[in-house]
Amino acid sequence: MKSIISLMAACAIGAASFAAPAFAQDKGSVGIAMPTKSSARWIDDGNNIVKQLQEAGYKTDLQYADDDIPNQLSQIENMVTKGVKVLVIASIDGTTLSDVLKQAGEQGIKVIAYDRLIRNSGDVSYYATFDNFQVGVLQATSITDKLGLKDGKGPFNIELFGGSPDDNNAFFFYDGAMSVLKPYIDSGKLVVKSGQMGMDKVGTLRWDPATAQARMDNLLSAYYTDAKVDAVLSPYDGLSIGIISSLKGVGYGTKDQPLPVVSGQDAEVPSVKSIIAGEQYSTIFKDTRELAKVTVNMVNAVMEGKEPEVNDTKTYENGVKVVPSYLLKPVAVTKENYKQVLVDGGYYKEDQLK
């Protein structure tokens, strides 16, 4: 009798475990293609999207491509072959996906570009992101405010770093920052001693911290043996950490030679700790929980045959079409407000930042 009861229990458990995936499959499957695990923010993004989609009853397929373009193409092709209903894609190179997205479009699969615009494709349905131009504005404003340029102080030496040239967002970040910095450069209140300006000269392929650190090393040895750096525009926290390491390597970070004002983005833990320690000056917080929520709302609408909510239908032209977008607001974070924004807001626990 005991064995029969055990068998019945096992069958019941088996039926229950089968029922959950069957329910999720009935609601639809969503493929999520993320670029890399080398940045903490993409891990958080992936986890947030999966959590919210599964809570909404969807089956998910989350893949990370290790910043390898052929790998990401293969992953997306597999998702299309498996018959996902929606693709959520944070591309490595937004110009390389046209062919695979054409396959997706032919099968009626909707495509949501996640935080990185996918270019040269008419099969991108929607775009969920932050106001990327404003990100750059906030980065540059944190620098100009700290230097006191509005109060007439200066001149100061600044060097510029851009993001990856294959990431459309990098140009928005840079253009936003330069909308603030260029008037001061033109007036001589900010001096780029290297003369290196423009994304073709200051871009950092794949957002690689080691590349940024090596470039900062070169700038210091070539242009600053008899001068000091007062500020560095950095578009991403990972680059900021590499830049600061380079600066500390030649003596910055002491009472006699303080670190320059260094910006950042993504509020990654090492950079928030650096801000608290008085090294990196600022970062830009982009709440990936909210971005995931917007994305899930888009998925829900698409699955129900409705038009998702968007708030921008003019800005993001991808070479083929203007992609309907939902833009979230970024927030500048410094030592003065990190606790209010990041800890009180529930994004981090205080002990994570110690």
From Swiss-Prot:
Name of a matching Pfam family: Peripla_BP_4
UniProt KW rRNA processing keyword: no
Superkingdom as given in the UniProt entry: Bacteria
Name the UniProt record assigns to this protein: Multiple sugar-binding periplasmic receptor ChvE
Subcellular location field: Periplasm
Induction of its expression: By L-arabinose, D-galactose, D-fucose in the presence of GbpR (galactose-binding protein regulator).
GO BP terms in the entry: chemotaxis
UniProtKB keywords: Chemotaxis, Crown gall tumor, Periplasm, Signal
